[in-house]
From Swiss-Prot:
A motif (LIR motif) lies at residues 104-110. There is a cross-link at K243 (Glycyl lysine isopeptide (Lys-Gly) (interchain with G-Cter in ATG12)). The keyword Ligase does not apply. It is an enzyme of class 2 (transferase). The gene is Atg3. The membrane-curvature-sensing motif targets curved membranes. The N-terminal region works in concert with its geometry-selective amphipathic helix (AH) to promote LC3-PE conjugation activity only on the target membrane. It is found in: Cytoplasm. It comes from Rattus norvegicus (Rat). Its EC number is 2.3.2.-. This is Ubiquitin-like-conjugating enzyme ATG3. One of its GO terms (cellular component) is Atg12-Atg5-Atg16 complex. The keyword Protein transport applies. It comes from the Eukaryota.
Length: 314
């Protein structure tokens, strides 16, 4: 039944997107949405700092006139996925469905019981090293640094702007050498762990209706054979399957359909992050959008080790 509902919603949104005019004036600071030009600028910034991501065109007949022909969407391929979501430690007590009647089946607050007051106070005490802009260190340089801490759990989308990830503490902001750590875990797991290794192709498109980026993914087994929908769902947080994540056709590529992270809350989350940075005396540039976007959607696909900024300082 949920699949039928998602299909109907998908068709309705296709019509709505077609009828929605292209956003011309920047509303990033006010609402968290971006124009196609800002999407391209953020994409260029992502490609520069994380070169595993590249621009692509897709099918000629599906080219969107409001985007440059050679910059229709972003793609990164052969992204490793070393384990299934069910293999990760999980506790129902740490999650709660929020806004169950919002029309999308409810959203998951991953760290519901971790102490909201403490988190809020931590965000209020943010100190910014630079009040003019955000400084970013290149991913390729930081990949070579020695790691002394264990991997941290993925932050949920609504938790991100409150969790302290915006603090200037480098130990907090420095996401770990994820790929190497996961490889080590796979090696330690023996032959069974190796056989479970999958890869994913990830895509970021511009959603004209929601006026935000949208993430797509398609998976393959260890023989590079396409995964079934049910197999891909194994690599997605089960509380987001068929709610936040649905199966839809890629707007620039031919079938088969792909998993897509629904963008209905992206602007809202980004707006909160912008406000948090501003309260600390800083300014979040729109060029940082995709780097932060990839961080907060990690909660949905926690076992897929894609490339995003490893360190940024407010």
């Amino acid at each position: 039944m949920q699949n039928v509902i998602n299909t109907v919603k998908g068709k309705a949104l296709e019509v709505a997107e077609y009828l929605t005019p292209v956003l011309k004036e920047s509303k990033f600071k006010e609402t968290g949405v971006i124009t196609p030009e800002e999407f391209v600028a953020a994409g260029d910034h992502l490609v520069h700092h994380c070169p595993t991501w590249q621009w692509a065109t897709g099918e000629e007949l599906k080219v969107k006139a409001y985007l440059p022909t050679g910059k229709q969407f972003l793609v990164t391929k052969n992204v490793p996925c070393y384990k299934r979501c069910k293999q990760m430690e999980y506790s129902d007590e740490l999650e709660a469905i929020i806004e169950e009647d919002d029309g999308d089946g409810g959203w998951v607050d991953t760290y519901h019981n971790t102490g909201i007051t403490g988190i809020t106070e931590a965000v209020k005490e943010i100190t910014l090293e630079s009040k003019d802009s955000i400084k970013l260190q290149d991913c390729s340089v930081l990949c070579d640094e020695e790691e002394e801490e264990e991997e941290g759990e993925a932050a949920d989308m609504e938790e991100y702007e409150e969790s302290g990830l915006l603090e200037t503490d480098e130990a907090t902001l420095d996401t770990r050498r994820i790929v190497e750590a996961c490889k080590a875990k796979a090696d330690a797991g023996g032959e069974d762990a190796i056989l479970q290794t999958r890869t994913y192709d990830l895509y970021i498109t511009y959603d004209k209706y929601y006026q935000t980026p949208r993430l797509w993914l398609f998976g393959y087994d260890e023989q590079r054979q396409p995964l079934t929908v049910e197999h891909m769902y194994e690599d997605i947080s089960q509380d987001h399957v068929k709610k936040t994540v649905t199966i839809e056709n890629h707007p620039h590529l031919p079938p088969p359909p792909m998993c897509s992270v629904h963008p209905c809350r992206h602007a809202e989350v980004m707006k909160k992050i912008i406000e948090t940075v501003a309260e600390g005396g800083g300014e979040l540039g729109v060029h940082m959008y995709l780097l932060i976007f990839l961080k907060f959607v990690q909660a949905v696909i926690p076992t897929i080790e894609y490339d995003y900024t490893r360190h940024f300082t407010m």
